[in-house]
């Protein structure tokens, strides 16, 4: 079941399912210690049923009668949830957020009475908490000093309470046994609209609280619910004191302002990316931040429902996922978050220079299914691409930010040990890496993806060595990389298939017996073929994009072109949903056995890899547009909230597996940035050959001089209503030069507008303004247009049009097509 809404701050993460029930509550680490994983925390209301003779009803939001829409407030990590119950004649509008600094979640509940009489509405919330992730030895009790219901065990405390009109209070409560000896929980106690008031329970426990609200006919009332997490009762008291002073609405206001500032801080010009894609880009950045622990661990996903399939979760740090996510954050302009991840890697890398399968957020090795013995010989239980990608990402970070003081210890503690490991963990017969597990964590062998990433990692290590003046290591790492490239060209490309193969599986198990001894191998003799020592896995796999992604071979190489053409043709899902599958006959969460039409479920990352390929090969802005339908496909298949799952149902588009998947959102970010950077390199002025489009806008508070710095005063943002801006405007005006009356139509094709601001700069009447990175018409000032057409002449991408006719001509000016009205 997907998590439609995650909200968090790096210490406290709370997730909601499609029925608007809390399903996960992680504290104090994101992804570790899920205190709400036992079952749904129900949310509901109790009131009379209008027209039913005084009959009463309690309805939880999981009931089918509710219509629920879950979104976020724009550019924030504050939810925007609407709930409607036609039988109860009640509607609710809710906002949820976690304070950007403190472990406090606030829910604002606005209740509207749609009946024609005054009513008492009881709001119920059920807590099915299990401290430390297990229902053993917990206590739930009502605390009169805290005026809340507290669950605790050892150094984990969670309190729930209500606020209304500045007053904190709970009107009813109950604690009891849950999930033991057939006890379903205290939510059953609420079904008659009353709670028994049991003040304490111990063992396998749950609780329910209620707040009574008097709502006049046709009016609405607002209350708040707060969830506070801490390490002790004393800490809860301090946080309660702070919240009482700040008030819940203050938390919502300050948290919304923080995340708007955070996501907008890079001042990116989104060029001609469609508005829905821009919105998904920003949402992806915000969702990414919810999945990252403040200690540096980037968690793959926090959706505990996956436990029903394997009794384990995705709530771990995979170095591969983490490296790719950190790289996307570096690209987007968030190096501080990425640095925390690189420092985490510095703490956990083994002394022999490789990373284990995955890690817990606290840095300890996590559960694994990779064996230490294969074919009766000791094996490395690793995915070598994870080691390579960390080094690859670190180099890209340094190259972009040049923070030499930061990377100096990483060069010593991470890059060198990892590079030495990658150099020696190779089959001397082929030059290729020795076997390990693949990125899909399913198969053992020598994988094209791993080969490409190890090549990229060694090239990155070579660059570090050059920067640090170590000629010997630079030559060593480069030589190993070139040997890998030669081996890939010789052994991984199939002339028969005219493409790269997925993997090689050794017949004689060339696996090192331990971490230090690597057995010597003789080179292949003249008449020996690769098939004599390796079995070739010819399966077409979307991860073959790696051969150009990590520059093992360039995207214009005929071998790469042929490979990617076959990936697109054979792995595109041939249903109305579309998208790219991982590989042919993918079994993971399989929906269809029609392999010809549905080779596997469509994955967001695999589909975006195809866009990456189109972007890499683009030579003109027109070539670049081949990627736009894939961006639009991604945005169109997200949940209503903008959350992306790992994969979707090929027939219904329902999310499958975990949701959100951090890697999915990171791939949106990195691919979009790559698109914009490529657009900047292609959209050049014909006169000066300089970029017309620039991805990075000038910051609104950029300091240009000491005088500017001294005079600057921050102000609260004043946002014009978007209703006054449009891509199309028509008006009638007298031409002062001729005295004649004209009809005019001004239009902007926002799909191709790259946000260069040239037309806005030449509009001296304030008719054109920049809104969300696009030039739009301010309808309030439209009649001020002097109709001289300068905005049309200066537009470098020909997206501005102005059509003028004499007013006596009854035919209205024809608007250029197609147009996207972003009003």
Label each residue range with its predicted role.
Residues 1-5, 233-235, 248-317, 340, ...:
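Low-complexity, Ser/Thr/Pro/Gly-enriched N-terminal "stalk/linker" regions
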Residues 82-84, 88-192, 207-209, 241-271:
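Polysaccharide-binding surfaces and accessory modules of carbohydrate-active proteins
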Residues 70-75, 82, 297-307, 317, ...:
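Helix-terminus loop motifs that line ligand-binding clefts
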Residues 161-178, 182, 354-360, 364-371, ...:
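Extended ligand-binding clefts on enzyme/binding-domain cores
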Residues 758-774, 790-807:
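Iron-sulfur cluster-binding cysteine motifs and their immediate structural context
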Residues 70, 119, 213-234:
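Short Pro-Gly-centered flexible turn/kink motifs
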Residues 1-86, 159-188, 254-280:
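An extended acidic
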């Amino acid at each position: 079941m997907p998590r439609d809404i995650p909200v968090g701050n790096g210490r406290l993460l709370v997730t909601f399912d499609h029925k608007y029930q809390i399903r996960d509550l992680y504290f104090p680490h994101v992804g570790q210690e899920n205190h709400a994983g036992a079952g749904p925390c129900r949310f509901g209301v109790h009131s009379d049923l209008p027209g039913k003779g005084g009959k009463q009803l309690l309805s939880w939001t999981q009931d089918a009668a509710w219509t629920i829409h879950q979104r976020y407030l724009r550019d924030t990590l504050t939810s925007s949830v609407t709930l409607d119950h036609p039988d109860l004649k009640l509607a609710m509008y809710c906002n949820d957020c976690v304070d950007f600094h403190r472990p406090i979640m606030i829910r604002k509940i606005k209740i509207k009475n749609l009946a024609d009489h005054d009513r008492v509405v009881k709001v119920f919330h059920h807590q099915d908490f299990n401290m430390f992730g297990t229902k053993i030895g917990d206590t739930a009790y009502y605390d009169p000093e805290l005026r809340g219901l507290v669950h605790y065990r050892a150094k984990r405390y969670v309190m729930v309470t209500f606020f209304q009109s500045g007053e904190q209070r709970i009107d009813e409560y109950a604690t009891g046994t849950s999930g033991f000896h057939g006890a379903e929980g205290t939510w059953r106690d609420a079904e008659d609209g009353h709670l028994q008031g049991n003040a304490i329970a111990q063992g396998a426990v749950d609780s329910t609280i209620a707040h009574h609200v008097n709502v006049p006919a046709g009016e609405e009332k607002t209350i708040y619910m707060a969830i506070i997490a801490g390490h002790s009762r004393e800490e809860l008291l301090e946080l309660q004191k702070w919240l009482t002073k700040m008030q819940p609405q203050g938390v919502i206001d300050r948290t919304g302002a923080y995340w708007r500032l955070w996501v907008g801080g890079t001042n990116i010009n989104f060029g001609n990316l469609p508005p829905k894609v821009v919105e998904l880009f920003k949402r992806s950045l915000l969702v990414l931040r919810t999945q990252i622990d403040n200690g540096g661990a980037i968690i793959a996903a926090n959706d505990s429902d996956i436990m029903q399939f394997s009794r384990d979760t995705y709530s771990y740090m995979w170095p591969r996922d983490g490296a790719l996510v950190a790289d996307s954050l570096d690209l987007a302009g968030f190096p501080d978050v990425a640095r925390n991840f690189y420092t985490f890697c510095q703490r956990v890398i083994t002394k022999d220079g490789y990373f284990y399968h995955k890690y817990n957020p606290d840095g300890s090795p996590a559960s694994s299914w990779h064996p230490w013995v294969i074919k009766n010989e000791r094996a490395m239980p690793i995915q070598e691409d994870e080691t390579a990608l960390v080094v690859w990402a670190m180099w890209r970070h340094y190259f972009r930010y040049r923070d030499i003081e930061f990377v100096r210890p990483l060069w010593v503690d991470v890059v060198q040990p990892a590079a030495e490991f990658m150099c020696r963990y190779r089959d001397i017969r082929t030059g290729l890496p020795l076997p390990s597990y693949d990125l899909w964590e399913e198969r053992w062998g020598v994988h094209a993806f791993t080969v490409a990433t190890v090549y990229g990692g060694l090239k990155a290590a070579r660059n570090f060595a050059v920067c640090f003046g170590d000629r010997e290591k630079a030559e060593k790492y480069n030589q190993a990389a070139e040997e890998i490239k030669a081996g890939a060209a010789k052994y991984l490309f199939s002339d028969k298939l005219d493409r790269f193969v997925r993997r090689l599986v050794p017949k004689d198990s060339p696996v090192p017996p331990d971490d230090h001894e690597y057995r010597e191998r003789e080179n292949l003799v003249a008449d020996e073929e690769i098939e004599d020592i390796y079995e070739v896995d010819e399966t077409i796999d979307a991860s073959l994009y790696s051969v150009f992604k990590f520059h093992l071979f360039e995207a214009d190489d005929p071998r790469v072109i042929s490979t990617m053409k076959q990936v697109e043709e054979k792995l595109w899902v041939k249903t109305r949903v579309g998208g790219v599958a991982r590989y042919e006959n993918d079994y993971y969460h399989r929906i269809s056995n029609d392999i010809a039409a549905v080779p596997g479920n469509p994955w967001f990352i695999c589909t975006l890899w195809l866009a990456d390929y189109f972007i890499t090969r683009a030579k003109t802005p027109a070539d670049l547009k081949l990627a736009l339908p894939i961006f639009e496909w991604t945005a169109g298949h997200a949940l209503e909230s903008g959350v992306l799952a790992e994969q979707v149902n090929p027939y219904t588009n329902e999310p499958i597996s975990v949701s959100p998947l951090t890697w999915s959102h990171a791939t949106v970010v990195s691919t979009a940035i790559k698109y914009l950077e490529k657009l900047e390199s292609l959209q050049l002025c014909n006169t000066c050959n300089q970029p017309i489009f620039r991805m990075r806008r000038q910051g609104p508070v950029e300091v240009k001089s000491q005088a500017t710095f001294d005079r600057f005063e921050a102000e609260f943002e004043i946002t014009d209503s978007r209703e006054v801006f449009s891509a199309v405007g028509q008006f009638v005006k007298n031409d002062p030069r001729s005295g004649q009356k004209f009809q005019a139509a001004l239009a902007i094709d926002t799909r191709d507008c790259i946000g260069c601001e040239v037309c806005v700069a030449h509009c001296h009447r304030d008719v054109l303004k920049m809104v969300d990175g696009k030039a739009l018409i301010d309808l309030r000032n439209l009649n001020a247009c002097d109709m001289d057409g300068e905005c049309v002449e200066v537009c470098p991408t020909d997206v501005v049009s102005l059509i003028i006719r004499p007013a006596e001509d009854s035919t209205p000016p024809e608007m250029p097509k197609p147009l996207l009205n972003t009003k």
